[in-house]
A protein has these predicted regions:
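Active-site microenvironments of metalloenzymes and redox enzymes
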Residues: 65-94, 110-130, 221-298
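Bulky hydrophobic/aromatic "packing anchor" residues in well-ordered structure
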Residues: 191, 196-197, 223, 272, ...
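Short acidic N-proximal helix/loop "leader" segments that mark the beginning
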Residues: 193-213, 240, 247, 251-259
Length: 382
């Protein structure tokens, strides 16, 4: 996967409408093979029913692009309370009185119609008075929000008990790395001690937690050019008795992986995925190395291979950058800052390229395994 580059041109109403349409087309393609029963089913307390995700996508769009920007009333009164991700834990969302089936699809369409009507009358120029609209920020935010939920939906689709293979899952996004007789031995990249610029520039869309761009002093470090592969993780399991990644099962002397209702042999040349931070940290210690900090990862990112196979756990807690300012709302970043969440960097095969920028900070609880997460090794400079 190509990492997104810095945006240097301002969006237009036409380009924004096209981005919204592209994101929605991709969302609908993901659920296209599914019937309403599968959309409404709760598969795990860790993930919402797909119907909730779809309604949340539409309701979030209505909140920001119709109500906040357009000043229009909601279509369904207090429906938004059921799609509040903070107030409604994932384990409870299947019991909420949310929209389903034809009513849900109609709501998504009606919200989009109102969104496009409001878009025609707003100022999205670089000099727009409202920072929410300046350079189309709020529209870029809504596109990113939908794209990120697509990855969450793909996490649930891994749990399907019927065969399903969306077009996105067929795309090969990771180039196998060479493996010698002793196991995977990726080259290490060396970075000297010094000052490195971290964070997103002022121009172009980025989330509040990616800013402000600032200088960070780093000690010298080494980081592997490629992520840890399944072959290397198999060796680790064999020597330590560690649990296999989520969805793996023993098949004689080998391993299979069952996801999206399809069972296939584990490809040893692919990056290991579906492991928790605790498992990644334990592997790194077994290998005599450590997880990189998120700043080390970002400094090295232009030189890393294999980004886009799996999110990569870092050793860093999710904290605000110096000079951080919440925008446009606290619930995206602020409520998660602290030592409870670990930062992941990079992207997975399920991540859209618009999200996969080198400054993007993903985060999750260290025990989570259903996310598309693996690791890359680092160590102090020798």
């Amino acid at each position: 996967m190509a990492i997104a580059t810095e945006v240097t041109s301002s969006p237009t109403r036409q380009s924004i409408a096209a981005l919204l349409a592209e994101a929605r087309e991709r969302t609908l393609a993901l659920i296209g093979p599914l019937g309403d029963e599968l959309l409404n089913r709760t598969y795990s307390e860790l993930l919402s029913p797909l119907a909730w995700d779809l309604g949340h996508i539409a309701n979030f769009e209505e909140l920001w692009l119709v109500q906040t920007v357009g000043g229009l009333p909601p279509l369904h009164g207090d429906l938004g309370q059921y799609y509040d991700a903070i107030e409604n834990p994932r384990r409870d969302r299947g019991e909420l009185p949310i929209l389903h089936d034809a009513e849900l699809r109609a709501y998504m369409s009606e919200v989009r119609e109102r969104t496009l009507e409001v878009l025609e009358g707003v100022d999205i120029a670089p000099g727009a008075e409202d920072p929410l609209l300046r350079e189309g920020f709020v529209y870029e935010m809504l596109v990113a929000h939908e794209l990120q939920h697509q990855e969450t939906m793909l996490q649930l689709l891994q749990m399907l008990d019927v065969p399903y293979r969306p077009a996105e899952a067929d795309r090969e996004r990771f180039e196998p790395v060479p493996i010698d007789e002793g196991g995977p031995q990726p080259d290490a990249l060396r970075f000297p001690a010094g000052t490195y610029e971290i964070g997103a520039p002022d121009r172009g869309f980025a989330y509040d937690n990616e800013r402000p761009r600032h200088a960070v002093e780093l000690a010298g470090f080494e980081i592997d050019r490629t992520a840890v592969t399944n072959a290397s993780y198999m060796q680790y399991m064999g020597e330590t008795g560690a649990e296999p990644p989520m969805y793996w099962e023993r098949d004689g002397q080998g391993w299979t992986r069952t996801a999206m209702g399809i069972t296939a042999p584990v490809d040893p040349m692919r990056p290991v995925v579906h492991i928790s931070w605790h498992e990644a940290d334990a592997y790194a210690r077994w290998a005599g190395k450590r997880l990189p900090t998120e700043f080390e990862w970002e400094a090295a990112s232009p030189h890393l291979d294999g980004i886009g196979g799996a999110w990569e756990w870092t050793s860093s807690d999710f904290r605000a950058y110096p000079g951080f300012a919440a925008f446009p709302y606290n619930e995206y970043s602020v409520v998660f800052f602290g030592d409870s969440y670990k930062v992941l960097r990079g992207a997975s095969w399920a991540t859209h390229a618009r999200v996969a920028r080198p400054t993007f900070r993903n985060w999750d609880l260290p025990q989570r395994r259903q996310i598309f997460a693996g690791l890359r090794l680092a160590e102090d400079a020798r």
